[in-house]
Amino acid sequence: MRKQADLVFQIVSLLTLVVALVALGVLVVDIFNDGASRLSWRFLTNIASRRAEDAGVYHALMGSIWVILLTAALALPIGVAAAIYLEEYGTRSRVARFIELNIANLAAVPSIIYGLLGLGVFVRLLQMGQSVMAGAATLALLALPVVILSTREALRTVPSSIREGSYALGATKWQTIWNQVLPMALPGVLTGLILALSRAIGETAPLITIGALTYIPFAPDSVWSKFTVLPIQIFNWVSRPQAEFKVNAAAAILVLLALLLSMNAIAIVVRDRQQRQGRA
């Protein structure tokens, strides 16, 4: 009876996986068929235009790269520092438990709430305006819970014998964390960062809330420039009544997918290299 139940569970799980992969494959193939004809160097290097055949994604692609790099620069050090405190220093304090509870809740907060927070704090209170910095700071808030939770999980995977051996050699707690624990946890930290950035780069609602532009004829050249990103540009083209702009939107989706896959590929390479160095 148990073997039959296990077999049924395996079959149901396999069918669920196949259905999900087929649905995803159909969507990707459909988008590729619609947008592949528009993909070209000209499409990648042209800026926005009211004529579909002349429009490109350079401004949105550069905006996405600016925003995601700044988001990583903000979320990584803050998230790792918070995780180190919660996991290594504040494990028994009430403050740490309160922070843990709120971080777990923040991971499930709708992204539009982060947009409203960014509008109130970064755009108005700190007077950053509708800039790349305001967008990156807002997305960093969105990414922080994921970075913190994944970093804590990575720190927990480091054997306690590593810490004890370091202490036995006379190292301080911080020296142990910096020289032993963090290098071993780095692959997991990078995985969590890429997951957080992959979510952030596809967000539209928070950036529209803080005032990111749906039409902009130039690429940002500093952190204080106005900007748009690929998801907003895709939304703009999909909203147009002309069929040619739908083709542009499909091509832009392919560019966004390529950007996401590139980020994940870089993370995998770095993670594997760190794991090999850790084994050595």
Label for each model-derived stretch:
Residues 6-9, 78-118, 149-153, 277-280:
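Cytoplasmic-entry segments and transmembrane alpha-helices of multi-pass inner-membrane transporters
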Residues 152, 156, 160, 167, ...:
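C-terminal transmembrane helix and the adjacent membrane-cytosol boundary/short C-terminal tail
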Residues 55-85, 193:
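Transmembrane alpha-helix signature in integral membrane proteins
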Residues 104-141:
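Generic hydrophobic transmembrane alpha-helix motif, especially the helices
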Residues 72, 150-151, 173-211:
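Transmembrane alpha-helices
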Residues 78, 91-95, 100, 163-191:
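Amphipathic cytosolic juxtamembrane alpha-helices at the membrane-cytosol interface
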Residues 1-17, 267-280:
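Transmembrane alpha-helical segments of polytopic membrane transport and secretion proteins
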Residues 48-55, 207-257:
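Interhelical loop and adjacent transmembrane-helix boundary motif
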